[in-house]
Amino acid sequence: MSVAARVPVIRVTAMPADTNPYGGVFGGWLMGQMGLACGSFASRRTHGKAILVAADAIKFPGAMAVGDELSVYVDLVKAGRTSLKLKAEAIARERDGEDEKVVAEGEFTFVALDEQGKPREIGRE
């Protein structure tokens, strides 16, 4: 599916506070944005509390600059009995143009919890 046909879970602009000591956007900030997007997706999909239990295969294939707009797209990789494995793709668009590039990607696993904080089954959709 093309990026144009997908809807981002999160869209945000990188600000000066989001930079590393070298002036580029901090990879930890990018990973955090992917985690937030996946958390939102997981809570909606499980209809309740879902917590992050693993972050795997994190890659930073590109760099982004302050002022660039970041869109995070989330896809379901696998739904288990109590967990979801999600793939996040973070794409940056130049502030004053239309050029886009993948700047981060990774897989995030969430577990659905009940009111007592115990894993609970999630419905199949």
Predicted regions and their residues:
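Short, well-ordered turn and helix-capping elements at secondary-structure junctions
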Residues: 16-18, 55-62, 92-94
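HotDog/MaoC-like acyl-thioester-processing domains
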Residues: 2-10, 64-66, 77-125
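Hydrophobic beta-strand-centered segment that forms part of the acyl-chain substrate-binding groove
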Residues: 38-73, 77-79, 83-85, 101-106
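Hot-dog-fold acyl-thioester-processing enzymes
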Residues: 1-54, 111-125
